């Protein structure tokens, strides 16, 4: 059995969970998330917690045990607190701004790159070089942050580009001159 899957998911008072077969709906103060879980796992709601158990002893069932528990836990945390990813833009002349809902990034190309957020995602820009992506679905927040980073990934020589705030860029030495 999965060590992660063994621990039950605690449900706060403000959150309601509806289990309908393999579809789990979580409603909370920040919104509602709905997800279809993979087969091979059973869900039981007891008072203010959800217990996830593998339905069989087969490998595919045991593989999905911890995954489903973590997905439910992420949904509960998303509707209560939400998720956010912070990115930094490094480089002369590189900046970002929000126009309406779209994020406009000037990252050294001949044109600014515009990104429209999917439903439930918001962009926030502080001081032209710090971008915060926030929402209730951890997966979508991470994907949107990765898309923004892929506009201009950080390069190892000068460190220019878009990077996560806590990301360390391993620097390389430049070419040495003729000797």
Curated annotation (Swiss-Prot):
Record flagged with keyword RNA-binding: yes
Gene: rplF
Gene Ontology cellular component annotations, sorted alphabetically: cytosolic large ribosomal subunit
Assembly and binders: Part of the 50S ribosomal subunit.
The protein's name: Large ribosomal subunit protein uL6
Keyword Transmembrane helix: no
Signal peptide (residue range): none
PROSITE patterns noted in UniProt: RIBOSOMAL_L6_1 (PS00525)
Organism: Prochlorococcus marinus (strain MIT 9515)
Function: This protein binds to the 23S rRNA, and is important in its secondary structure. It is located near the subunit interface in the base of the L7/L12 stalk, and near the tRNA binding site of the peptidyltransferase center.
Pfam families attached to this UniProt entry: Ribosomal_L6
Domain of life assignment: Bacteria
Phylogenetic placement of the source organism: Bacteria, Bacillati, Cyanobacteriota, Cyanophyceae, Synechococcales
Biological process annotations from GO: cytoplasmic translation
HAMAP family, sorted: Ribosomal_uL6_B
Keywords: Ribonucleoprotein, Ribosomal protein, RNA-binding, rRNA-binding
Family classification: Belongs to the universal ribosomal protein uL6 family.
Molecular function (Gene Ontology), one example: structural constituent of ribosome
């Amino acid at each position: 059995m999965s060590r992660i899957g063994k621990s039950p998911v605690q449900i706060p008072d403000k959150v309601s969970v509806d289990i309908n077969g393999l579809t789990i709906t979580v409603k909370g103060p920040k919104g509602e998330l709905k997800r279809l879980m993979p087969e091979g796992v059973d869900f039981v709601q007891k008072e203010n917690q959800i217990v996830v158990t593998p339905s069989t002893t087969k490998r595919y069932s045991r593989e999905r045990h911890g995954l489903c528990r973590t997905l439910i836990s992420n949904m509960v945390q998303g509707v209560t607190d939400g998720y956010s990813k912070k990115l930094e833009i490094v480089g002369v002349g590189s900046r970002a701004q929000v126009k309406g809902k779209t994020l406009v990034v000037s990252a050294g190309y001949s044109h600014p790159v515009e990104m429209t957020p999917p439903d439930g995602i918001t962009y926030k820009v502080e001081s032209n070089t710090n971008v915060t992506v926030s929402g209730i679905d951890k997966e979508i927040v991470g994907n949107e942050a990765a898309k923004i980073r892929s506009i201009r990934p950080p390069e190892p020589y000068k460190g220019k580009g878009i990077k996560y705030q806590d990301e360390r860029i391993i620097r390389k030495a430049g070419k040495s001159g003729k000797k």
